[in-house]
Amino acid sequence: MNEKNTLFNWFKLVVKRDLVLSFKKIATFMVPLVFFLIVITLFPLALGTEGSFLSTLSSGVIWVAALLASLLAVESIFNEDYRDGTLDQFLISGEPTFILVLAKVLAHWLVTGAPLLLASLISTFFLYLPEGLLFPLLISLLMGTLLLSLLGALGGALTIGKTAILSAVIVLPLSVPILILGVAI
């Protein structure tokens, strides 16, 4: 019982630490959110404002924008901790590594995925999403953005210290099945 409590406290500590650090750097969560909103805003401008045409594309546009926006924040999962030596301290602490990874993924999702989820709720009005598809879209985005954060952790871990584009090249092909399943609502 004491070991479970210690692991949960470790988990909470890492999540809280990452959230505090992320909100100190406003660009960490604002860049993906602003990118998402720009993409959503440009689609009706580029394709016209005909409601029936936009409504057929709306869930796909939201999903593609969410996928591309989440790729912008992939490098921030582990790179800063690697640069300042915190990641090494985490690894030699003796705590299970999976707790660290899950905590960092949850913090990453709370900083990038949750705002995208809220922004997608607003963006459905721009794209004339049919009312019956709103709830399934939000549920699929909830699960999909969590999975994208997990894949982002994989790409971020494989490319620690490298350029951000490399992690995007690794994560993008792996995220295509999530995109296909998410759009098929």
Could you describe each region identified by the protein language model?
Residues L71-L91:
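Transmembrane helix boundary and interhelical loop/hinge segments in multi-pass membrane proteins
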Residues M1-V31:
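Aromatic- and glycine-rich beta-strand/loop motifs that create alpha-glucan
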Residues A46-L57, L121-L142, I185:
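Membrane-interfacial helix-loop-helix connectors in multipass membrane proteins
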Residues I26-G48, W63-L67, I170-L181:
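Hydrophobic alpha-helical transmembrane segments of multi-pass membrane transport/permease proteins
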Residues S58-V74:
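Long, hydrophobic alpha-helical segments
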Residues M143-L172:
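A structural motif at transmembrane helix-loop-helix junctions in multipass membrane proteins
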Residues E95-W109, P136, S167-V169:
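Membrane-interface alpha-helices at helix entry/exit sites of multi-pass transporters
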Residues L102-L127, L147, L179:
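Hydrophobic alpha-helical transmembrane segments that constitute the membrane-spanning cores
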